[in-house]
A protein has these predicted regions:
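Cytosolic regulatory regions of ion transport systems
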Residues: 1-139
């Protein structure tokens, strides 16, 4: 499997590490030089320096042959644009976007992004699962 991950923040790097450990070939895209260098040193020269929301950068990264495209940027709008380019211009089969704003999650799904990870929902569900046993104990 060939996967592209946009964004070399903590989330992007963790996903890339997991994909590599699982045997996937990966390329990351990062537009901030310092983050690109850090990720290259950590993961082994697999990062394209550029803007993941542009056709040119995605072309350089080999998006046309990607099986999976994951956008982990801090902006829902940038994640949406990156996934739209991957899905509709490069015809990537599977796209995943992180959504920091729950109001945008449904819109991202409506726009054809295959999997939308709603960070707010995940955090809320995790806290609820941890706190629920405490509430039962108090009864």
């Amino acid at each position: 499997m060939y996967a592209i991950v946009v964004g070399c923040g903590t989330t992007g790097i963790k996903i890339a590490e997991w994909l590599m450990a699982s045997g996937a070939e990966i390329t990351l895209i990062e537009k901030i030089t310092e983050k690109q260098r850090f990720a290259d040193n950590l993961l082994g020269s697999v990062v394209v320096l550029g803007d993941g929301t542009t056709i040119d950068t995605q072309n350089t990264a080999g998006t046309k042959r990607a099986d999976l495209f994951i956008a982990t940027l801090s902006s829902d709008e940038d994640n949406m644009l990156a996934c739209q380019i991957a899905k509709h211009y490069f015809e990537v089969n599977r796209t995943i976007a992180i959504s920091a704003n729950p109001d945008n999650a449904n819109l991202l799904r409506l726009l054809g992004i295959d999997i939308v990870v709603d960070v707010t929902d995940l955090i809320t569900e995790k806290i609820q699962s941890l706190v629920a046993p405490m509430l039962v104990e108090d009864l």
